[in-house]
């Protein structure tokens, strides 16, 4: 915990999803939630077959799912989502990539998380 899963479409310019991006996201998670950085785990999934709306121009997306142990306040989860969204938007903008960018923050049940 925390777990970050970054899904993105194959039209994302190469090199955007990197250890540097994950490190930036990890630091945001630590700053906002107080989690131990050594427990942050990130992975990415590229989607080659996708459709956004009815678009035929191949517009893509980035979606970050963040799972943290339950117990954080609504305000903490809102701040976390907003800051991560800002970092992802900045990254996409810097790469010149126009895509839908979303973040979802989910709780992990302490009763059902085993380590």
Model-derived features with residue positions:
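A domain-level signal for the structural core that forms small-molecule/cofactor-binding pockets
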Residues: 1-115
């Amino acid at each position: 915990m925390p777990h970050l899963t970054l899904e993105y479409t194959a039209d994302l310019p190469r090199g955007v999803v990197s250890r540097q991006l994950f490190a930036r996201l990890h630091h945001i998670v630590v700053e906002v939630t107080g989690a131990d950085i050594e427990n942050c785990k990130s992975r990415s999934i590229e989607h080659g077959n996708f459709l956004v709306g009815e678009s035929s121009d191949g517009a893509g997306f980035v979606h970050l799912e963040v799972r943290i142990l339950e117990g954080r306040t609504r305000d903490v989860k809102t701040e976390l989502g907003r800051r991560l969204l800002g970092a992802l938007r900045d990254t996409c903008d810097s790469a010149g990539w126009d895509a839908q960018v979303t973040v979802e923050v989910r709780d992990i049940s302490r009763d059902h998380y085993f380590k």
